Amino acid sequence: MKKRSAALAVVIVLMSHHIAAADLPVHEVQVLAGKFAFDPPTIQVMTGEPVRLVIRSKDTVHGFSIPKLKIEVRIPKGGDPVIAEFVAPSPGRFEIACSEFCGSGHGQMKAALISVAPVTTNR
């Protein structure tokens, strides 16, 4: 019974976090992949806010991966957008990498997602 109660408590906490995030406006960021770089090279978001990345390639097929957030999308060549939506669960720096071999500079195709805690005021 204790395990079931603990599991239910976890589900309720996760659901309340999801519902709270759903009430916030979506932070949309346009990301361009090409020539062994992501633009912008650093993306800053608020912890707990819904984020929508609209990712396009300006040259060949790329991947967009944030392993710690379990985000993995394939970006086709031709400029068609791919959407990645998520909520950063905690403050921190998360590495972004190209996960599709795209040429000699593939290993250096990295960027960063910075999640910052919301500022709270005590009045």
Residue ranges and their predicted role:
Residues 30-58:
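N-terminal targeting signals for Sec/Tat export/insertion, comprising classic cleavable signal peptides
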Residues 59-78, 104-111:
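Histidine- and aromatic-enriched segments that form or immediately flank copper-ligand environments
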